[in-house]
């Protein structure tokens, strides 16, 4: 659309064209008041993306304020590209998780690939070198042809981008549930390492300093991507395919290396990724944070398509682009630095003192907006909240008691459930060993990477059981953070902090907003108890298809520090003769469990309870024992209960088995999903030391016969399965479903 054909300010108002951009009547009236006039088409577009939920968090900000965001090791909390935590030796870890759900529903390969690209840029824009990627994925049931297509292409997109850019994808989770049929979730997390003195922030300051554009040229891809991410998916969404960006990982690799060199230069004032809302958000946010203004000449913006209008250039979400502020008079050295990597850096504007975003095009001012109105002073809404009827119904139900007659068959059926089954089909497509720092590869409780030049390592995981959160958002929110911490502790690391991706439905529905509020309440409480502040994150709302919301899914990304690489622990049993202990008692808790879904085809009732004092005590005891060198293996008991966790401990070995004794209600002992529990193996010579440190129950020992044997105290056999048989079911489930014709 040329400038001549753009609607006039009067047309925009009278024909309510702003509504098509996602602005409400009230918001348009606010814009008129801020500007003291009607906005033109470019200005309306700029306000619409900056005031979208995706950029402004206007519906979620009041809720996000509940999170604890500070701690003695936190160097950077929410509000920048990524959060940063001190890990000693002058080093820090930077990490963040983000969603790319809507684009992945429409164009799964590019949607997932550019999600990975964007999160990498967030981390290196802080000056950190990305060392690892993780992801958290949700799809509908794997029996549907459409879900198979989305699953295969999302995984290929993540692999294609991460492998080319040379950053290992080391962990994550994949779950399947009908609630995600039309709206998959693709959350990508990146972890980086940085020296304290190299930390950069996205700030524009210093009147007269140069605003510089670096990276790929601007095209028409991704226009209104931020607005697209702030509305529900409908039958019409397919037509929005042009709103999905296209990624170039080789350009990203060059940009990464060049930016990591430029952050060491004192010529750099600030740097930010052009992410959601592209040039608009990066310029407005940097100016607002610095307390300055920015003016740019859009004729100077590198373009790869002819005849682009200011509206298109400002709203494009073309990938692999960064905005820099450089000291006046030092531009040449920055040009030369980027040229060394075959990249063009281009001066497109300067920092001003009037706190305005002023855009020129063909000699005329085409937009003039106060930067604070776009960034920190964007409107904030306190949405009404209402407890859903389904929640009251579930709370009133009698506890669900499953009827299980054949324990062996039930265990094999659970191992074949796609959510529990081996994800090897996924991670074998990822290069998880590139850069050779990966110590614990995908498949254990958490991934572990050593930190070169030190004796330390980092453990990292993504976790969230969305079924529990659907049944009871507050309890489920607590469990999500606690489970992430369990996975970190089982790896021999102390949990440091979290990043979160809050994936929910439409916040304008009071029942959905209630889910968001309650989940955040639960998460916040556990973060305080465990001392893991929230240092970064992302909100993805409007995850609905034709009015049906996904399960509320606040994904937790957590990083922990292994003080000494000798403490690194995995879930795999180590040698025959080691003693097997269980930490924690099983109760009859099956609401939202894998067993309930397997037997009933749906979930209902109450989520498992969690006692935070018990949780913290058990985690601390286990970590102390691991650090004392008396634990051979550790695994948390999660989806599928004790039997599934025990099977995973033996399936991770070469030829080992286990013989354990259980008593009481066998179904609960084997399959209940009671929280705060672990399976631990200990060498016989460490038995006394271990039992002094940890309150645990001795239940059996590791064998060398390749069999999982579960007996009652009377000697009656409950389960006797060869590890090979279990492994073939567990490993074959996902490939088998993908091959089958629905």
UniProtKB/Swiss-Prot annotation:
Q: What Enzyme Commission number(s) does the record list for this chain? A: 6.3.5.3
Q: Which domain of life is it from?
A: Bacteria
Q: Which InterPro entries match?
A: PRibForGlyAmidine_synth_PurL (IPR010074), PurL_linker (IPR041609), PurM-like_C_dom (IPR010918), PurM-like_C_sf (IPR036676), PurM-like_N (IPR016188), PurM-like_N_sf (IPR036921)
Q: Do you know which PANTHER family this protein is assigned to? A: PHOSPHORIBOSYLFORMYLGLYCINAMIDINE SYNTHASE SUBUNIT PURL
UniProt keywords (A-Z) are: ATP-binding, Cytoplasm, Ligase, Magnesium, Metal-binding, Nucleotide-binding, Purine biosynthesis
**Catalytic residue list:** 54, 100
Q: Which organism is it from?
A: Geobacillus sp. (strain WCH70)
- Keyword Ligase assigned to the entry: answer is yes
Family per similarity comment = Belongs to the FGAMS family.
GO MF annotations in UniProt: ATP binding; magnesium ion binding; phosphoribosylformylglycinamidine synthase activity
Q: In which pathway does it act?
A: Purine metabolism; IMP biosynthesis via de novo pathway; 5-amino-1-(5-phospho-D-ribosyl)imidazole from N(2)-formyl-N(1)-(5-phospho-D-ribosyl)glycinamide: step 1/2
What protein name does the entry list? Phosphoribosylformylglycinamidine synthase subunit PurL
């Amino acid at each position: 659309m040329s400038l001549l054909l753009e609607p006039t300010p009067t047309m925009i108002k009278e024909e309510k064209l702003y509504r098509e951009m996602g602005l409400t009547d009230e918001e348009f009236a606010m814009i008129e008041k801020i500007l003291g006039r009607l906005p033109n088409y470019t200005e309306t577009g700029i306000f619409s993306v900056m005031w979208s939920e995706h950029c402004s968090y206007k519906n979620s900000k009041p809720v996000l304020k509940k999170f604890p965001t500070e701690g003695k090791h936190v160097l950077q909390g929410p509000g920048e590209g990524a959060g940063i935590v001190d890990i000693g030796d002058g080093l820090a870890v930077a990490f963040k998780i983000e969603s790319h759900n809507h684009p992945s529903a429409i164009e799964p390969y590019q949607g997932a690939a550019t999600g990975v690209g964007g999160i990498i840029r967030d981390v290196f824009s802080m000056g950190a070198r990305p060392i690892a990627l993780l992801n958290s994925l949700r799809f509908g049931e794997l029996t549907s042809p459409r879900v198979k297509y989305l699953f295969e292409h999302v995984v290929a997109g993540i692999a294609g981008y991460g492998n080319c850019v040379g950053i290992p994808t080391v962990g994550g989770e994949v779950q399947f549930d009908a609630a995600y049929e039309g709206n998959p979730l693709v959350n990508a997390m990146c972890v980086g390492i940085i020296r304290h003195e190299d930390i950069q922030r996205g700030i524009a300051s210093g009147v007269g300093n140069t605003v510089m554009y670096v990276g790929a040229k601007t095209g028409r891809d991704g226009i209104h991507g931020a607005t697209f991410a702030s509305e529900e998916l409908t039958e019409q969404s397919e037509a929005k395919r042009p709103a999905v960006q296209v990624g170039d990982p080789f350009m990203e690799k060059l940009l990464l290396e060049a930016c990591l060199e430029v952050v060491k230069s004192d010529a750099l004032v600030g740097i930010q990724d052009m992410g959601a809302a592209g040039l608009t958000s990066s310029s407005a946010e940097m100016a607002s944070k610095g307390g300055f203004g920015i003016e740019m000449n859009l004729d100077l913006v590198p373009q790869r398509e002819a005849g682009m209008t200011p509206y298109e250039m400002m709203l494009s979400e073309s990938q692999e682009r960064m905005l820099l502020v450089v000291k006046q008079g030092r531009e040449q050295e920055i040009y030369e630095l980027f040229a060394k990597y075959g990249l063009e850096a281009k001066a497109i504007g300067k920092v001003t003192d009037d706190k305005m975003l002023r855009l020129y095009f063909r000699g005329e001012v085409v937009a003039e907006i106060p930067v604070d109105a776009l960034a920190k002073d964007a409107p904030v809404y306190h949405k009404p909240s209402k407890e859903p009827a389904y929640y009251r119904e579930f709370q009133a139900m009698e506890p669900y008691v499953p009827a299980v007659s054949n324990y062996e068959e039930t265990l094999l059926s659970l191992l074949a459930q796609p959510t529990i089954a081996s994800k090897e089909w996924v991670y074998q497509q990822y290069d998880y060993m590139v850069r050779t720092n990966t110590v614990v590869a995908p498949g254990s409780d958490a991934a572990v990477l050593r930190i070169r030049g030190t004796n330390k390592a980092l453990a990292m995981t993504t976790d969230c059981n969305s079924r529990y959160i659907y049944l009871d958002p507050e309890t489920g929110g607590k469990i999500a953070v606690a489970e992430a911490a369990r996975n970190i502790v089982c790896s021999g690391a102390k949990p440091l902090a979290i990043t979160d991706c809050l994936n929910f439905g439409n916040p304008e529905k009071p029942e959905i907003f209630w889910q968001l509020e309650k989940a955040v309440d639960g998460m916040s409480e556990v973060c305080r108890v465990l001392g893991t502040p929230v240092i970064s994150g992302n909100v993805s709302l409007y995850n609905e298809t034709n009015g049906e919301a996904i399960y509320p899914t606040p994904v937790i990304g957590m990083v922990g520090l292994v003080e000494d690489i000798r403490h690194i622990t995995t879930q795999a049993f180590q040698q025959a003769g080691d003693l097997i202990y269980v930490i924690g008692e099983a109760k009859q808790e099956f609401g939202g469990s894998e067993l309930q879904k397997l037997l009933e085809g749906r979930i209902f009732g109450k989520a498992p309870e969690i006692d935070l004092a018990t949780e913290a005590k058990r985690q601390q005891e286990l970590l102390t024992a691991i650090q004392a060198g008396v634990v051979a293996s550790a695994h948390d008991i999660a989806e599928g209960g004790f039997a599934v966790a025990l099977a995973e401990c033996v399936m991770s070995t070469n030829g080992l088995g286990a013989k354990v004794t259980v008593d009481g209600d066998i179904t609960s002992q084997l399959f209940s999903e009671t929280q705060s529990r672990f399976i631990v193996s200990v060498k016989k010579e460490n038995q006394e030391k271990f039992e002094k440190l940890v309150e645990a129950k001795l239940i059996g020992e590791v064998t060398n016969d390749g069999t999982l044997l579960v007996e009652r105290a009377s000697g009656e056999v409950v389960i006797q399965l060869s590890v090979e048989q279990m492994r073939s079911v567990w490993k074959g489930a996902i490939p088998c479903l993908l091959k089958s014709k629905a």
